[in-house]
Amino acid sequence: MVKLKVLSPNGTLFDEKIEMVIVKGAEGYAGFMRNTQPSIFAINNSVGYITYPDKTKKSVVIENATLYCNKDLIKIFALDFVIADNLSYDEIMKRKKDLESKIKDTTDTKELIRLQHALDIELLKLKEAK
């Protein structure tokens, strides 16, 4: 087992012992577990997968992150990290509609990019919501 700790600007989002985490970077998916060589890995906005000690697996949605690992600890510094089981389809659809409305009404390029990024994250969450 290895400890996975996820930190964000809003505090600690996850802090548990796991068997493995699989995340997606620019070059594809990579898995990290106990005794992995020390590494730094950039994570794209993507879906990752956690395997727990009891062999259950859960999907997670990760927003712009960097992973650091050594043999006993994996740290992920992310803007957001949400376990798919905790996602609400109705809440995501509401945020999606709000963002689409704002995008339609926005003329500022910087704001449009920010809103589009937020919409991309909501669409990723929508794929994983049950």
From Swiss-Prot:
Keywords: ATP synthesis, Cell membrane, CF(1), Hydrogen ion transport, Ion transport, Membrane, Transport. GO terms for cellular component: plasma membrane; proton-transporting ATP synthase complex. It comes from the Bacteria. Gene3D superfamilies: F0F1 ATP synthase delta/epsilon subunit, N-terminal. It is found in: Cell membrane. It is a peripheral membrane protein. Disulfide bonds: none annotated. It holds the Pfam family ATP-synt_DE_N. GO terms for molecular function: ATP binding; proton-transporting ATP synthase activity, rotational mechanism. F-type ATPases have 2 components, CF(1) - the catalytic core - and CF(0) - the membrane proton channel. CF(1) has five subunits: alpha(3), beta(3), gamma(1), delta(1), epsilon(1). CF(0) has three main subunits: a, b and c. Belongs to the ATPase epsilon chain family. Produces ATP from ADP in the presence of a proton gradient across the membrane. This is ATP synthase epsilon chain. It comes from Mycoplasmoides gallisepticum (strain R(low / passage 15 / clone 2)) (Mycoplasma gallisepticum).
